[in-house]
Swiss-Prot record:
InterPro entries: ArsR-like_HTH, LexA, LexA-like, LexA/Signal_pep-like_sf, LexA_DNA-bd_dom, LexA_repressor, Peptidase_S24_LexA, Peptidase_S24_S26A/B/C
Site positions per UniProt: Cleavage: A93, G94
Name of the protein in its database record: LexA repressor
Catalytic activity field: Hydrolysis of Ala-|-Gly bond in repressor LexA
Superkingdom of origin organism: Bacteria
Amino acid sequence: MSRKNSDTKQLEILRYIYDTVENRGFPPTVREICAAVGLSSTSTVHGHLSRLERKGFLIKDATKPRALEITAEGKTELGIKPKEIPVVGVVTAGQPILAVEDISEYFPLPPDLESDAGELFMLKVHGNSMIKAGILNGDNVIVRKQSTANNGEIVVAMTDENEATVKRFFKEDDHYRLQPENDTMAPIILQQVSILGKVVGLYRNNIQ
């Protein structure tokens, strides 16, 4: 097989692996790859998989027969744009400010959150009220859209003044408490609160 034909077959295999994972949630077996791309020899497929791995397009786990993961470089080779999270403005972690709902940019979706794709957004945090939870001024929080939360979860909530804030959520007897993670700051006590989502991730781009 010529170099050009070999490269074409490898891309065909890579595409089949990607499509299979997207459709059913786990990779194909080597025999399934053989049938899909018209190869009769499993050793030939193993050779193509090894070359795809050397090129940085695929990650294999030799101890698990179906452990095939396409890398970001592999997806780029297939012309697949990475999934992205919309960045929808700024939320304060000190005193609440008016929420900004316009999408300002997009952020690559972390692989471990792909199952929540379409339900996530990102907000930049200003203020120090959540520092004991590890959320610092300038951090970006990844938020899964949901309208309810359990006590103790960190949420993005709208106050009754139509302002947004990041706090730890508590529902108490006759009110809601949005609790900062900073001993110098008081909680926000509300009769009504609207939860925009739960904080499920954090991105910091200024690590020293």
